[in-house]
Design a protein with these regions (language model features):
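Acidic/histidine-rich, surface-exposed loop or edge segments in extracytoplasmic proteins
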Residues: 64-80, 209-217
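Feature captures C-terminal
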Residues: 26-40, 84, 88-91, 95-97, ...
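Low-complexity, intrinsically disordered regions enriched in charged/polar residues
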Residues: 12-13, 17, 52, 123, ...
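Short hydrophobic/aromatic-rich motifs at helix boundaries and adjacent loops
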Residues: 14, 62-67, 120-124
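N-terminal targeting signals for Sec/Tat export/insertion, comprising classic cleavable signal peptides
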Residues: 33-64
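Amphipathic repeat-derived elements
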Residues: 56-70, 160-172
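Bacterial Sec-dependent N-terminal signal peptides
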Residues: 1-32
């Protein structure tokens, strides 16, 4: 909306005006008030019986779809810059996912903004993965020359860190400058080509990671099953089939000095 040439944002505001056409012109909005209501577990203490009855048949169906367990994690995993257990795990899963496509990426990048929830210790359900990765992002592989890889890491440093896979060790400054970076313990060779795993969203240069737009030999399968959340679920299922509890830790992939 615009008022007096200025944009006016109305958040969490619902206005219901029920007037007949004959009287509509007599009414003018005198004031609009808004408030935010935090929807959290405090509302569980006194559930509305009528609302619960209405939701029950739908909840049962949703729970049957989202409730199945795909794996287990050893401890709570959260996402935060410059490095986190959860972002580390997701990037390692992208590298792992390469085998499905006969790809061998040197490293992977997953944007922190694409991780929409944390994981709690114990069971991981389909619903947990959907909450964490709700977007229709597909796994993507591309090739970057070393000079563009360095440019990419500079852009990641400017953002204060993003999700990086195990091969990466980078040091950044508090004001977002890249101090150093290695891949598998070796300096990045500006003339060498590197295969990278990421999301198709990032491969388009989004989230200010424009170096990705220089990628060549881009492979981003668009089938539904190549959605990143299904790659994540498949990883958990494979670990569960092997009797493994999934672990991840902070190990200096991105350090601020």
């Amino acid at each position: 909306k615009k008022k007096n040439g200025m944009k006016v944002a109305l958040a969490s505001t619902v206005m219901l005006l029920m007037v007949s056409p004959a009287f509509a012109q007599k009414y003018k909005v005198a004031k609009v008030e808004r408030t935010r209501i935090l929807v959290d577990q405090k509302w569980d203490a006194q559930p509305d019986a009528e609302a619960a009855r209405f939701i029950a048949p739908y909840k049962s169906k949703v729970d049957s779809i989202m409730g199945p367990v795909v794996g287990h994690i050893a401890h709570d995993m959260t996402r935060h810059r410059p490095e986190s257990e959860l972002s580390n795990l997701l990037c390692d899963i992208l590298v792992w996912g390469g085998k499905q496509f006969e790809e061998q990426p040197v490293f992977a990048v997953y944007n922190m903004g694409g991780i929409r929830s944390n994981l709690a210790k114990g069971k991981v359900t389909i619903g947990d993965v959907n909450d964490m990765a709700p977007f229709e992002n597909k796994i993507c592989f591309l090739t970057l020359k070393g000079d563009k890889v360095l440019e990419l890491f500079q852009q990641i440093a400017h953002r204060g860190g993003e999700g990086l896979s195990h091969a990466v060790r980078m040091v950044i400054t508090k004001d977002g400058k890249l101090k150093s970076v290695t891949l598998n313990g070796e300096p990045v060779d500006p003339e060498k080509s590197y295969r990278v795993a990421t999301l198709d969203y990032l491969a388009e240069g989004n989230d200010q990671l424009v170096a990705f737009k220089s990628g060549t030999d881009v492979f981003a399968p668009k089938q539904k099953e190549n959605n990143v959340r299904y790659i994540i679920m498949n990883y958990f299922r494979e670990m569960q089939a092997q009797g493994k509890v999934v672990e991840s830790k902070i190990e200096g992939r991105c350090v601020v000095e």
